[in-house]
Every structure is written in C-alpha cells, then in structure tokens.
C-alpha cells in the first residue's frame, strides 16, 4: 500500500510545486523506493488540450494519449517513470464524470453535491494504482484559498482521515518575500497561508520556503513555532541556476529526510545520487557552446515549448556542450529576409503549432537551413513546413500548402500536400475523424510505432529500424507526394507500419536535415537524452567548429 505525499502551495502561484514534487520523487527513488507522481488541476477545462499555449503553456502528452499539464513532463524527466492518463485530472474531468454517472442513474436518485459525490470522485482518482508503488506524490494545482481548489483540499483532507495514521503527509510550499527597504525576509505571508490551510483541516508536516535570500536560523525557528512544524521540517527552497540542481539542493536542505521522518521510516536507506552528480557535472563543465534558433509561434512564453528547451539542454549534456537556445517569432520572417537573423546560428529548430499564423516564416526558415547546410530539426508542424518548402521549391508544386490553412478561412487556396487525417490504425482498430468533430481529445494522440528505412540517418541515430514515439496532430503529410519529393532528395525515412502515414523525412545530401511528425522532446531525460536531440546538437557542434 502506497504512502501518500500531498504537495500544496500558498501565498502565490508558480512557486515551483511541480519541480519540488519531481525532485522529491527523484530523491525517494535514490533511496530505493518506487514512486508515482500525479497532478490535480482545479481548472474547469476537461484537460488542457484545447487551451491556448499563452494560457497554459505546453501540453504534455503521455504514451497512452492523455493531454496533460507540463508538470508531468518534469515528473517524467526527473524520475524516468512514464506518466499515464490516471496521473492527471482536472475539476472539469471530475465534474464531467460525476454528471455522466448522474445521467446513467448511478446515484439512484440522490441529490448530487460537492460533498460527498465530487470529493468521492477525487478520492477514487487518488486510489488508482496505490498497490503498485511505495510512494504516491500528488500535487494540487493553484494555491490554498482558491475557490476552484476547495473540493480538492476537502478531498485530500478526507482521504488522509480514511487512511491509517501515518499513511499520508502534507508538504506545503510558500513564499518568503524579501523587503529591500528593511533588508529582511517576511514570514507573515507563510504564517497566514498555513493558517488558511489549517482552517480547512489540513496541518502541514513539511514546509518548503521559496526564497531568493538565505533564511536565517531564527526565521526558521519562528516559522516552526507559529506554524506548528518541527524545525527540521522547515526546508529552504532557494532559486537555482538550473532545475536539475533541485534534487541535490533539496537533499542538502534535508527534504527527503524530513519526509521520511514524517512517515516514521527509520533507519532510512542512504541515497545514491550519482546520476544527479553526473548531470550537474555535465552542465557545469561544458566544453563549448552552440547557438540554436527556435523559430516558433508562441515564443513570447517559453513554457509553451518547455520540453523542447529541456531536450536541447539534454542534447548539450550528451555532447558536453552548452546550448544557447534563442527564440525567434516566425511571423518576423513573413516580413523580413531571415538571413540576417539566422546568420551565426549553428542549428535551427522549428517546433509544432496550430493555425496558419507564422507558417510562411517557418517555411522560410526551413528553406534557409536547407540551402545553407545548417542542421535543421522540424517537429510536427515543423516537419510539415519543411515538406511544403520542398514541394514548392524543389518539386515545383508552387501552391503547395496545408489543408489546415484552407479550412481556417473556408476556401481553397493551396494544393494540400498536408491533409486532414481522417483515419488511422490504433492498436487493433481504426480511428475515424471528421473536420467538424469536437476539438478536444480528437487528435492522433499518444505513442505509435514507426518503421525506419534501413541505412537512413534516423535509423543510424536510433540504432534501430523500429521506434515508438508520442504524437499530437490532426494533419499529416500526404503520402501520394512521396515519389515526387523523394525524386528531389527529400527521403521519407520513417513510415507508420502500414506505410500510409509519413513519420520522418530527411535530406541525405545535407549535413543534418530531419523532420519528424511526432514529439521526441517528450521522451528526453537529463540522464537519457533523446537520440535525435543528442545527434542534432552533435551536428551543431560540428558546424560551430567550422565557423
């Protein structure tokens, strides 16, 4: 039976609960325990799949096709444990489940209420898989006091009451603001946050104090006294140069020991933190630097491409090279010649996205990389833009475009070399889709197998002719243009097992030019960099040596 750690936040949002949860999971693993991490989001969307990247940031996709919060990416990167659909839930999903049960008559005519029906649904979610691991770490999104989060806080309060004593603990992350005029840290916001938490029946066992400045011992003692927490369980959470320092930093501060003490686990197994020491060594002792241009649509918010940024860092680790990623709005290239902006970069990456805005700029970036011999990695829409560029400029399909862009305005302007995907094989059945289907949850989502051409660049990179990668798309390159494009040098080196869906394109007579329909960044980890990103950065290093 799993022990439960509930991670909550107070004072302000975006303090780093997800990273704290991921780091704690990594530390418990380092002591020999098995872990699973979960995220409970209070928003009323069923999932983040239809939310704007500017609202939510990246949508992280799991192997089984769940569209989830980017924190699940942190969980996977830090622990290596693949997330599942059952590791993410929102208020919208909970209420949807409750209302479906009411319509079916599952409640036998009872009046449906937040307590007990909504809270019971949340508790049922928490119980799934509790016999599989030693520790279940559950992060509650938002901050204590948010009206949307109240059912979740009530549910975890009840859940802890239902379990035997010592099976659940609460870790609360707050902010210690620094007042520069008086040169002091203020503890009152933390005290009020804990007071708010205690008022709804939850007493924190461990406090994490986010601070930019050193926390004096007397302030820790004061917080321990007023918040009724052991002084050893008052843990500093300082700002760090890199998120990958978090496991070592939290271990130095005693987080993992405080958690094990709260559970009464003694003597605690000693941690083996060698993998994290190696990660930091590779980051701190990089032997060079490469510049990578990310030509995207949502560049104002880097969280929109969080996994890509981290995967590039991992690729740098694999080559002991520092990666300086620079974000360029693709719309700029629709007005300007990309050459002055892209000169000096050692590689170009065009990530995924939706809609026509910025796509002509991405096409011009792909053309620049192809013509100048600059390493290019196109992901999802980035692959489609590379194909459209090749169709226009090499295969002489002058009006080549995507069916997505015509569908947006309701009239035909392009010859669609990229079309709306109407059916595909998933497991043992065929999935069918129409243009007027609901937007949410209707894309080709999750892990799918691809067959790679023997002798191709990607087969060499992967060391295999069969791979499995995660997808999130509803448009696909039309395989009917394969012959024309391959005749111009663009090889379809990866296909779905049935040969109908192009998964990878590459240019052989180019230092490094690869487009992939899937999202390799979602499977990259600091201690296991994704092979595509590792080789992409290797190619960038080669270019940097020629400059």
Curated annotation (Swiss-Prot):
EC number: 6.3.4.2
Positions of CTP binding: 13, 146-148, 186-191, 222
Binding site for UTP: 13, 186-191, 222
GO molecular function, one term: identical protein binding
GO aspect biological process, one term: 'de novo' CTP biosynthetic process
Mechanisms controlling activity: Allosterically activated by GTP, when glutamine is the substrate; GTP has no effect on the reaction when ammonia is the substrate. The allosteric effector GTP functions by stabilizing the protein conformation that binds the tetrahedral intermediate(s) formed during glutamine hydrolysis. Inhibited by the product CTP, via allosteric rather than competitive inhibition.
Gene Ontology cellular component annotations, sorted alphabetically: cytosol
Domain Glutamine amidotransferase type-1: 291-546
Pathways per UniProt: Pyrimidine metabolism; CTP biosynthesis via de novo pathway; CTP from UDP: step 2/2
Transmembrane segments: none
Subunit record text: Homotetramer.
Function text: Catalyzes the ATP-dependent amination of UTP to CTP with either L-glutamine or ammonia as the source of nitrogen. Regulates intracellular CTP levels through interactions with the four ribonucleotide triphosphates.
Note: CTPSs have evolved a hybrid strategy for distinguishing between UTP and CTP. The overlapping regions of the product feedback inhibitory and substrate sites recognize a common feature in both compounds, the triphosphate moiety. To differentiate isosteric substrate and product pyrimidine rings, an additional pocket far from the expected kinase/ligase catalytic site, specifically recognizes the cytosine and ribose portions of the product inhibitor.
Protein name as annotated: CTP synthase
Source species of the chain: Cereibacter sphaeroides (strain ATCC 17025 / ATH 2.4.3) (Rhodobacter sphaeroides)
Gene: pyrG
């Amino acid at each position: 039976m799993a022990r439960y750690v509930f991670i909550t936040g107070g004072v302000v949002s975006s303090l780093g609960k997800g990273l704290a949860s991921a780091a704690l999971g990594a530390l418990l693993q380092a002591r020999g325990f098995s872990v699973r991490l979960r995220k409970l989001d209070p928003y009323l969307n069923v999932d983040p799949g239809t939310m704007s990247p500017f609202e939510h940031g990246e949508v992280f996709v799991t192997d089984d096709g769940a569209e989830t919060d980017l924190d699940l990416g942190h969980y996977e990167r830090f622990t290596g444990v693949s997330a599942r659909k059952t590791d993410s839930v929102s208020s919208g999903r909970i209420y949807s489940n409750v209302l479906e049960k009411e319509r079916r008559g599952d409640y036998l005519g009872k009046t449906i209420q937040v307590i007990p029906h909504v809270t019971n649904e949340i508790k049922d979610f928490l119980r799934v898989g509790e016999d599989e691991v030693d520790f279940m770490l559950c992060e509650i999104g938002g901050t204590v006091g948010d009206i949307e989060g109240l059912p979740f806080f009530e549910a975890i309060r009840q859940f802890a009451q239902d379990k035997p004593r010592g099976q659940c603990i609460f870790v609360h992350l707050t902010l210690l603001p620094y007042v520069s005029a008086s040169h002091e840290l203020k503890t009152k916001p933390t005290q009020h946050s804990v007071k708010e938490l205690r008022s709804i029946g939850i007493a924190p066992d461990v406090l994490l104090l986010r601070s930019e400045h050193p926390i004096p011992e007397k302030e820790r003692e004061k917080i321990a006294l007023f918040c009724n927490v052991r002084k050893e369980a008052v843990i500093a959470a300082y700002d760090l140069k890199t998120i990958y320092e978090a496991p070592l930093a939290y271990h130095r501060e005693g987080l993992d020991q405080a958690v094990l003490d709260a559970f009464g686990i003694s003597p605690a197994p000693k941690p083996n933190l060698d993998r994290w020491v190696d990660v930091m060594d590779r980051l701190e002792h990089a032997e060079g630097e490469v510049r990578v241009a990310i030509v995207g649509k949502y560049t104002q918010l880097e969280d929109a491409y969080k996994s890509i940024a981290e995967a590039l860092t991992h690729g740098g680790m694999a080559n002991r090279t520092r990666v300086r990623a620079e974000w360029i709005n693709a719309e700029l290239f629709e007005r300007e010649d990309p050459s002055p902006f892209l000169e000096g970069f050692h590689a170009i990456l065009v990530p995924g996205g939706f809609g026509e805005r910025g796509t002509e700029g991405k096409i011009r970036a792909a053309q620049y990389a192809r013509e100048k011999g600059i390493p290019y990695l196109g992901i999802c829409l980035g692959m489609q833009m590379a194909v459209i560029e090749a169709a226009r400029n090499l295969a002489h399909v002058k009006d080549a475009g995507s069916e997505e862009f015509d569908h947006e305005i309701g009239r035909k302007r392009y010859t669609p070399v990229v079309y709306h995907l109407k059916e595909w094989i998933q497991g043992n059945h065929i999935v069918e889709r129409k243009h007027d289907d609901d937007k949410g949850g209707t894309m080709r989502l999750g892990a799918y197998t691809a067959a790679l051409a023997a002798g191709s660049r990607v087969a060499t990179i992967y060391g295999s002719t069969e791979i499995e990668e995660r997808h999130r798309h509803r448009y696909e390159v039309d395989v009917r243009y394969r012959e024309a494009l391959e005749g111009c040098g663009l090889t379809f080196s990866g296909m779905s097992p049935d040969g109908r869906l192009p998964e990878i394109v590459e240019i052989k007579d180019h230092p490094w030019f690869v487009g992939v329909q899937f999202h390799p960044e979602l499977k990259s980890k600091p201690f296991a960099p994704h092979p595509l990103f590792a080789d992409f950065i290797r190619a960038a290093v080669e270019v940097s040596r020629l400059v």
